[in-house]
Structure formats: C-alpha cells, structure tokens
Amino acid sequence: MTTLLNPYFGEFGGMYVPQILMPALRQLEEAFVSAQKDPEFQAQFNDLLKNYAGRPTALTKCQNITAGTNTTLYLKREDLLHGGAHKTNQVLGQALLAKRMGKTEIIAETGAGQHGVASALASALLGLKCRIYMGAKDVERQSPNVFRMRLMGAEVIPVHSGSATLKDACNEALRDWSGSYETAHYMLGTAAGPHPYPTIVREFQRMIGEETKAQILEREGRLPDAVIACVGGGSNAIGMFADFINETNVGLIGVEPGGHGIETGEHGAPLKHGRVGIYFGMKAPMMQTEDGQIEESYSISAGLDFPSVGPQHAYLNSTGRADYVSITDDEALEAFKTLCLHEGIIPALESSHALAHALKMMRENPDKEQLLVVNLSGRGDKDIFTVHDILKARGEI
C-alpha cells in the first residue's frame, strides 16, 4: 500500500494489520496530513492545549536534591497538565482528528489508566462516546483511575484473557476496531502500533521538547547536556526527544523499566533485552519466549508494563543517537521518595524511573558540571496506594 508518510523508521515500524483495517489507517493518515496543513485545526488544537490542558507546563529547577554536586537538574512538569500526565496532549489531537473524520465513538486501551482518563476527558469534552479496554489486573491496581473514567462517561471493559494486562487490552481494542472502524476511532495511547500512529503521537507530543528547549535557553542560556525520559511504549520520551534529535550535543536518554532486575527476566526492557519481531501492528524489539510468543513484561508501574517499544525509539537506539538504560523497581521507588521528601513533588512511578537515572548520573559524577532535564511525565496520585503497600510491607511506615 502506498502511504503519504514513510511508515518506517529504518527497518522498524510498518503496518502489520489485518487487511480489513487498512482503509481505516489510510483514512487516518489522510486526515492527519491534511490537519497538519490546516491553520484552523492547529488553532483549535493549540487553544485546547492552552486553555483546557494548561500549556505551556512549567520547567522547575530542583532546589535541594542536587546539593553537594555540580549538577543542575530541571523537571519538565507534565504532571501539572490537566488529567495528570502527558497523555492529555495527544488525545486532544486525536479526538479532534476523530471529529474531523466524522467518527462518533472512541475506542482506547489503557494500562495505568492514565491514557484511559485522558481518552475519557477528551471524549467528554468533544461529545464522543468512549469505551476503554483495560486488563482485569490493571482494573484492580488502578481503581481511582477506573472511577475517574466512569465519572466522565466512559465504559470501562475489563479484559480477562491472557495475562489480563495492557497487551491483552491492546488486542481486544484492535479486535473491536476491526468491526467498528466506520463509526469509531481507535485512540492509541503511545507512540507505537501500526503506521501512522507512531508519527501522529510524536507530532501531538512534540510540544514537550519544543517548550523545554525555549524554557531552558531562557533560564540557562544554553541547551541541556541531556534530556531524560522513561520509556514504555515511548510517547512522553519521543515528545521530549523530537525537537532535540538534530541538536547533536544534547544527549537523549530513554529509561526502560528494569523491574526486579534484568537478570530475573521480570522486567519491561525489550529495547535492550528483547528481540525484533512483529506485534501490535509493527516491527519492533519485543520480549519474546524462545518460540516467539510475546513474553510477559513486568514493572512496578503499570504504565511501563509493555512488552514492546515504539519504532522510532528502536531506530534511535540502532543508530546510536539515543541511549537506553534500565532502572529497577527499587531504584524508581527511591527516586519517588527522594522527590517527595526534598522537593515536595509526588511523581508518577513511571516518571520516577527517569528521575532515578538522573540521580544516578549525578551521584556517579558529583563534581561534573552537567545540565540535565527530566521529563516528569505524570503525577503520582494514582500510585500512592501501591507505594503505601510496599513501604508498609517493608516496615518503613
């Protein structure tokens, strides 16, 4: 099939979907390309970002956790966005695209519930019906977000098949869309899946990096030495990286979830520790068993618990333009506690992975002068029960 935009990033990406979905993907690509050139669409999107979501978000300089080092650390505060995370940015864009295509329903999948909440709020705002597939395990883990979605009129459908987590919710959402794409838009929640989703999601998240660049130049008079973001599917990271890719002096660091430790096999780091395969409509690195079945991913944070990764991250890794590392549950939890105690900010467990790597860079080279920006992709209100239970079990509270 000929496409308007390149469906690949190097060898990664593509459109590995049933033939029945090809017209829906083609229609979506056409709508996106025309919307990008339409000043009216852009004005509407920018108005929602500013006056509904609360952009631009702040760039906060850490006051205390860098004490005794030569590191200057800033946090890009996506946690301050309406809805509580970066997810709100791109769902507003996709919801406007859905309206542009004449769709009346939204289908979405969610892990931590953040994308579900974002999809529900965008649907409520723009008068779209919304149904959200969520792994039954995640429904239990993330009850506050489930209730938020239902408050905003979304139907939440628990998925009991397979591991009852995000990958199963993705499969069910795609199955639904196969039979309903004439009236429904599939609101994919990350920069992964079949073309054109990775490109659409990047473009609807790229204001994160654009704002960061302008803000850091204003505050410090120079670009950062590195920008750091957590990577599950990779939308907050690609949103931060996109505007810095051509700034070759700026390091791009993506942080995958190391779970209980890479050596245990219980992690969510397919980019560095998986094999390339085809899953979820794309060719990308993924966690696979010996015989090629998709393996369970694991992370303390439901939003990073994804067995594959967006194709552009795979490409940036293969070319060496970005570095990808992993952080364990315990390291992320320590970073979570550190930010709460010393800066008065409760970060999402997802974002705590990126923060943990920045703290590691700082501790390993305390005398090194470095200017770092962490994408604080979401707030941790949704995680306080998880953290409470862990700290209680350890006797720390």
From Swiss-Prot:
GO molecular function: identical protein binding; protein homodimerization activity; pyridoxal phosphate binding; tryptophan synthase activity
Modified residues (N6-(pyridoxal phosphate)lysine): 87
GO cellular component: cytoplasm; cytosol
Catalytic activities: (1S,2R)-1-C-(indol-3-yl)glycerol 3-phosphate + L-serine = D-glyceraldehyde 3-phosphate + L-tryptophan + H2O
Statement: the UniProt record of this protein carries the keyword Lyase: yes
InterPro entries noted in UniProt: Trp_synth_b_CS (IPR006653), Trp_synth_beta (IPR006654), Trp_synth_beta/beta-like (IPR023026), TrpB-like_PALP (IPR001926), TrpB-like_PALP_sf (IPR036052)
Cofactor: pyridoxal 5'-phosphate
Any Pfam family the entry gives: PALP
Keywords recorded for this protein, A-Z: Amino-acid biosynthesis, Aromatic amino acid biosynthesis, Lyase, Pyridoxal phosphate, Tryptophan biosynthesis
GO annotation, biological process: aromatic amino acid family biosynthetic process; L-tryptophan biosynthetic process
Pathway per the UniProt entry: Amino-acid biosynthesis; L-tryptophan biosynthesis; L-tryptophan from chorismate: step 5/5
EC number assigned by the record: 4.2.1.20
Superkingdom of this protein's organism: Bacteria
Active-site annotation: 62, 86
Family, per entry: Belongs to the TrpB family.
Record's subunit section: Tetramer of two alpha and two beta chains.
Function: The beta subunit is responsible for the synthesis of L-tryptophan from indole and L-serine.
HAMAP family hit by this protein: Trp_synth_beta (MF_00133)
Protein name: Tryptophan synthase beta chain
Organism encoding this protein: Escherichia coli (strain K12)
